[in-house]
Amino acid sequence: MMDEQRKAEYESQSLQLRAELKQFEAEWAQKNDGKKPSREAIKQNPDIAQKYKQYNKLRDILSGKIPPPTKSNNQDPSQRKRKQPETSLPSASTPSKRNRSAATPKSQHYSAVHEAITPDVARKLFSPAVPSSIGPTPQKDGRVLGLFDLISHTPSKSTDETKPRASGFTATPSNRRHALDLENDKDDDDHDEKDGKEFITPSIPRHRNLDRTPSSGRNRNLLDSFLGVRATKTSTPLNKNTGNSPSKNNLTKTPSGERSVSKLQFATPAFLRRTSAPLPPVDENGEWLDIEPLKLPRKPFSIAKGKGLSSVVASLRKMEEEKLDEELDMLREMEAMEQGGMGPPPPKQTVASTSEDTEKKKQVTDPAGAEVVPEEENSFEEDEAALIEVEASFLESPSSKRKKERRPVLLSGFDDENFYDSQDEEDLSKEGLDRNGQPLRVFKKKGQKRTTRKVNMRPTRTKRPSAPIAEEEDDGEEEHNDVIPETQFDATKNLDGDDHHTLDSLSSGGSGSEFDDGSEGEDEEAETSTTKAAKAAAKKKAPSAKEKTKKDATTETKKKKGTKEGGDEEPAKKPRMVKATANANFKRLKLKNNGAKGGPAHNSRFRRRR
């Protein structure tokens, strides 16, 4: 809490400053048409700007936002006494008083010391490839920078405190350094870092990173870590005290030892190394060693295009078998030479040849007609078979024998194809048998079904009328003289199966197909009915004499009754007359799906709308 006295002092100061600022604003408004001063105008007048800052500070103290300053902080820095007496300073020395409040405060950061020492080759080799540009965005080595990264720090003080300084360069000579020799420069530098720093004239140091975009220390460390550059002070491997480095303090030469030029040219970058173990140091003064060939990884086993793994394994198995067969042939030749200069052994037997040999052995005939095999050949074949069995049993492992006993052997890439291959199905199909020897089922080829109706056209044969019917017609000619026989319907023709010569067909004069009411389907049905009737009539026998007499009697009685009742004969049916204007275009079509969309009145112009 503030005292009442101090609070009154702050209030009086704030009122006085407020009155001065109001007077300034009034004068500014008179000059600028009643406008208030802008921030740029206030910044151009440093006295008024200072008064604004002081007034805002006093208002914050009175409101409690800022604690009141203590007496030590409130004291003017110009009133401070010197810690060292003036007698200790030389007469020509620059006064040691420095206005440190003018310096821009900056956060502590670690500068990469080795950047001035490590060559550019190392930075390129030991850092990942970064795109040089991303676009119009402000960036540094491919990394986008923010607004605060573009602010450069004040160059009033060197950012590198460990940078070696030449003795007496842009520095005020102190009383201690004035009496010392150049040999004790290093000891004086260590001692002056504590006491003599205050007597150095502020100067603008030479920045070695003038080609880089200025950024804050924190972001620079992040960028250095991102680019693979170490930013600590102790991480740079400096020159060791070896024979490669001539002097300790010669920092302008390329460092040797672990990071030599020869190593920088051929070393693998850190992010590509598989092991983090350090490499042995390279002696630059030694002889140049030949570069060893690169040990590249083997190409993966690639299967040929269109081949599976089983086919590849089978081909490898065949190659191994061929190699073993060659070795076996050589063994046979050696055995033949040892046995007494016998001729060369017979060629190796395939599965087919062995099967033929077994069949020959099985074919046992009479001694007179049997083919006697010489004993020498039999003995040689037996020895060879025994040798093959011994080799097979030697090569087979007990586990494989057990597996063979347990389950049947399956065909794989390591088996002989000829041994397991069955008879070709093509040969069996030629014989008309399947695998089991059963006759194959004959399948009919399925093609497109018929789209039109198949009609078998057969000639129709007409038969002459029988004798009794003709006699009856002769007897009744007198009664029916006025009737034309060509126009009358003949029942005998229908019985014989001749339906073509109807009254309609006669009256149409050969053009019944054009003016017939029936459609094509009806014509086809008529044709089939005629053929069936013709067949049925051919099968039937001629009627007996009794049946003929009965029919004649019935017809006579019917005629007599008709004459008695009607007085006159019934008029004959008139033939159908076809108009001369009749045409096939005017014939009504009898469609099968008529009425499928709503009856005959569908889409009709002269029907009532529903």
Swiss-Prot record:
Transmembrane segments: none annotated. Residues 28-115, 127-261, 338-610 are annotated as: Disordered. One of its GO terms (cellular component) is DNA replication preinitiation complex. It comes from the Eukaryota. Residues 86-110, 232-261 have a biased composition (Polar residues). GO terms for molecular function: DNA replication origin binding; single-stranded DNA binding. InterPro entries: DNA_rep_checkpnt_protein, Sld2. GO terms for biological process: DNA replication initiation; double-strand break repair via break-induced replication; mitotic DNA replication preinitiation complex assembly. Residues 373-386, 414-428, 470-480, 514-527 have a biased composition (Acidic residues). Residues 442-464 have a biased composition (Basic residues). Residues 28-42, 493-503, 544-573 have a biased composition (Basic and acidic residues). Keywords: Cell cycle, Cytoplasm, DNA replication, Nucleus. Pfam families: Drc1-Sld2 (PF11719). The keyword Ligase does not apply. It is found in: Cytoplasm; Nucleus. The keyword Chloroplast does not apply. Has a role in the initiation of DNA replication. Required at S-phase checkpoint. Belongs to the SLD2 family. This is DNA replication regulator sld2. It comes from Neurospora crassa (strain ATCC 24698 / 74-OR23-1A / CBS 708.71 / DSM 1257 / FGSC 987). The gene is drc-4.
